[in-house]
Amino acid sequence: MSYFRTAILLAGLTGLFMGVGYLIGGAAGAMIALVVAAATNMFAYWNSDRMVLSMYGAHEVDAGTAPDLHRLVAELAARAALPMPRVFLMDNPQPNAFATGRNPENAAVAVTTGLMQSLRREELAGVIAHELAHIKHHDTLLMTITATIAGAISMLAQFGMFFGGGNRGNNGPGIIGSLAMMILAPLGAMLVQMAISRTREYAADEMGARICGQPMWLASALAKIDDAAHQVPNREAERAPATAHMFIINPLSGHGMDNLFATHPSTENRIAALQRLAGQSGSATPDPAPAPRGPWNGGAPRRGPWG
């Protein structure tokens, strides 16, 4: 998805929010909704990373407590021309990961213990590179904004349904139209949020593959994580499904294929896209970029920068 289309979708979310506000309080309600949207996004801008990391019980690690992971993130961040993000570990058996933070200078990468135990070093590099791609694309802020506005639309619509719309003049939509809008607006907001999330995943897959130098490392990791996500529950994510879009693979049980209600593209489609990228880049041959010494290898030259 182009950034222009993303901007259009964000504008649509804001318009939905103002529309619900209008149905409740007329023009004044629309303006109040706009102010509320700005205020909630400002709060999310400064606090969302701490909130989500705390929600998942993530604890920060460093070169002393998790040297291999920390060194891998540092090397990949340097390769991506990014500041070193903070690194967090979640005590969770489901292999998964996400990135958060308002900008690259205040970003964090969080991985589960299940991910560390399930993946080979090359696959872990692919996952970390994918999360760094989200940071590089400023997707962490984008998804925070969309989730915040979508949540506010649902909350405001519920408020309107409980108290009834206040804009019922002759030129208004009437009570039936108001109720329909208040029911459909949250659904529309969710669809827009999911559309943005799904397409940003494709962009992060491509950039992540270029950062680590081997698209198939990420493809292999996605297959393993997706298989495990169907079998290993993520209880924290089940309690907070609004955060599911943050993860590299949908952490919720029962997630389906590539459809309007999916938080992520289907894993099969993502792997196919990475396979096409591998064919275009000729990644079956050694990566043309200089290969830095990786955290797990013994210095022997292998395919790609870490394997």
UniProtKB/Swiss-Prot annotation:
Belongs to the peptidase M48B family. GO terms for cellular component: plasma membrane. Its main location: membrane. One of its GO terms (biological process) is proteolysis. Its cofactor is Zn(2+). The active site is at 131. One of its GO terms (molecular function) is zinc ion binding. PANTHER family: PROTEASE HTPX (PTHR43221:SF1). The keyword Transmembrane applies. InterPro entries: HtpX_protease, Pept_M48_protease_HtpX, Peptidase_M48. This is Protease HtpX homolog. Binds 1 zinc ion per subunit. It is an enzyme of class 3 (hydrolase). Its EC number is 3.4.24.-. Keywords: Cell inner membrane, Cell membrane, Hydrolase, Membrane, Metal-binding, Metalloprotease, Protease, Transmembrane, Transmembrane helix, Zinc. It is a multi-pass membrane protein. Zn(2+) binds at residues 130, 134, 201. Residues 278-307 are annotated as: Disordered. It comes from the Bacteria. Coiled coil: none annotated.
